[in-house]
Each structure stands twice: as structure tokens, then as C-alpha cells.
Amino acid sequence: MQVRVSAISYLNTAPFVYGLENHPISKKIEIEYVTPAVSASKLINGTSDIGIIPVASIPLIKNARIISDYCIGADGAVASVLLCSGKPMNEIDKLYLDTESRTSALLARILSENFWKISPEFSDFDFSKEELDLTKSYILIGDKALTHGGLFPHVYDMAQEWIKYKNLPFVFACWVSNKELNPSFIAEFNDALHFGMANIEKSVERFVPRFDRDYAIRYLKTNISYNLSADKRAGLSEFWSLAPDELKSKVRWFG
């Protein structure tokens, strides 16, 4: 029986997708491409076995296990998770949150209360049904941030803001399973991710011409930090500690 994998087709996951599709493990897995929020819900309800999961949703998954030392993280500006606003930070009174990712929404709430010292009204926003208003304030994630972020007069990189606040890198998503998997399969899965990381230049081809090829490669190599290092684990633990009680970490770490 194939292992069911929920993956995300944002540019920042391109190396992972390339690795899983072009490694021998492709014969052992069934990949479905969904949004971050759907990836999390599929692991929560048991319709997927592995997923690249926004970190705010990981504690909601029963028997969650982080199974890889690869992640979607940032040691500096991430460029693809942004607060984009028509007004300066201290004037923001309403902030629209992307329903595709629980992590960016929770990060916005934590930074608003503890670092930015603002108290906006938060409202969900469905980008597939509504158009952006450049006079308003939004959290943009993934390819939407890369495409539309530069249109706004005030842009704040969420990873940079977290680093200013905590002096720790930020982790946006990890590879998680909701069940115990054979160690040999996990090793092969990680080898596939490693193969993708070794082929970043090839991995971006599916996103051209939507993104300029050189820009896409530079973004993946400069803005995204894929190694789930000790500092990133510390940053992730700190993020979970600031979350509501129901999101306190109950997660088993890989290794």
C-alpha cells in the first residue's frame, strides 16, 4: 500500500516536490498537492500519512511526529510571508489573514500583541474569491506574497520581524507523519528530499515563466533555509510556547 503524502505546490517547496517525484520513492508514495491548511486537515483527519505542515497546526495532529531534518524556514527575510499594508504599522486597525495557513495568522497575532504593540481587528480573507485593496492590510503568504507584495506602500517581512523580536530563526512548516513509519522508509523519504535540494535549479522549471528562473533560484537559495537546525528548533519551541494552550507542543521530534 502506498504512503499518502500531502504536498504544497508553492515555489518554496519546489525542491521537495522535485525530489519526491524524481526519486525511486515515487513508486512508494501517492502525492496530492493542496494548500497548507488542507495539508494539515488531511493529517488531522487521517486521510494522509505524511504532509508538509504549517507549524501552528502540528500540535493539532494526533501522534504527530516530525520525520525530517528539512523544513521551510528562514534565518533572515523570507520574502514569501509578508504583512502588506496601505498604511504604516502603527495605523493598522484591521488585518486580513490568509485562510490557507494557520501559522502566518498565529504569527501575526503574536507579533501584534507582543512586539508591534498594536491591536487590530483580525478577519479571514479568501484570496480566491476577493481582490486585494491596496489601502488595506493583509498577511500574504507563498506565491501570493512574491507576486503582490511589492504593490503595497508598506511591507513587513514576517520572518525578519520574528527574528527582531526573538533573535531566533523561524520555521514555517515541517514534514510530519501521524503514525509510526518504517525507519527505512523515513530514511528513503529524507534521501528523496536531499535529492531535491541537490537539484534546486531543475526544481524551479515547473514555475517558469510564472516566475523568472534566475529570481526563483535566488529566492530558494537566499530566502528559504531548509535545514531544521538546533537554532530553528529553538525558534519553533519558542513560537509554540507563545501559542494558545491548545497549541502547546505535544510533538515527537525526529531522531
Region spans (language model):
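A local structural motif
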Residues: 24-32, 115-125, 248-253
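Hydrophobic residues within well-ordered alpha-helices
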Residues: 42-44, 132, 243
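Conserved beta-strand segments of alpha/beta enzyme cores
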Residues: 4, 30, 65, 119-121, ...
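Short, glycine-/small- and polar/acidic-enriched structural segments
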Residues: 11-91, 99-100, 104
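Pocket-lining segment of extracytoplasmic ligand-binding domains
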Residues: 124-206
